[in-house]
Amino acid sequence: MLIDFHTHLDFYKEEELFPQLEKFSGIIVAASVDENSYLTNCRISDHIQKTNKLCQIIPTFGIHPNQADQNAPLLDDPTTTARFIKYLDQSPLIGEIGMDFCWSKSSPQNQEKVFRWFLDYCNKTKKACVIHTKDAEEKICNILTDYPHARPVIHWYDGPEKIYREFIRRGYPQTFGVETIRSKHLQNLLKSTPLNLLLAETDNPESEPWLGGSRNDIFLIERVYSELSEILNIPRTNLEQILEENFHCIL
């Protein structure tokens, strides 16, 4: 079974997305970046449930660090937080959340406020959460010690090896995707990752074109599986079984 653990289905044009989903067999975790993103992913999931029983879409609610400035003030409004908590209760896991000191224009203070708000929920409910760490790896590593019952999944880590080793020591699962085949650093991290902490992703539809590739279709996850299999020198069928087992350990 193919499992794409991190995508942004709401970024696609629906007239391009739906024909692909109707042919896909597997599981797609549809990460959200804010409220509207989550509601769009839920609508996509509802549509595909009626047209392709072999394609399971899992919408997850989160607020990306890029959206922190707009959303941090909303967390002081009880009506809004009640609505957000309803979305969180509906989500089998939480994401995309985190901090970004490289590309995000949101203030570090607002990023941390939003991140901690979600971590507090995950800590209370023991739900898994998918975390964006770009250039904020050390800060996030320290913050996570305040939430021992949250269950982080680290998305597309490409930071310092020292912090990666600490994340592995804590047992945080790691996603690897389309950049892995292009990066010796990521390949070294992949090879040092216990197989029971490994997940695959595409971060579709923007990541592959951002890296200079031409594809952004949902079947790109097949190529990611093949590339990870090659790098790890593991038969593709064995890797599929490992990733499926890891997925079910998280959800």
Label for each model-derived stretch:
Residues M1-L251:
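Mid-domain alpha/beta scaffold segments of enzyme catalytic cores
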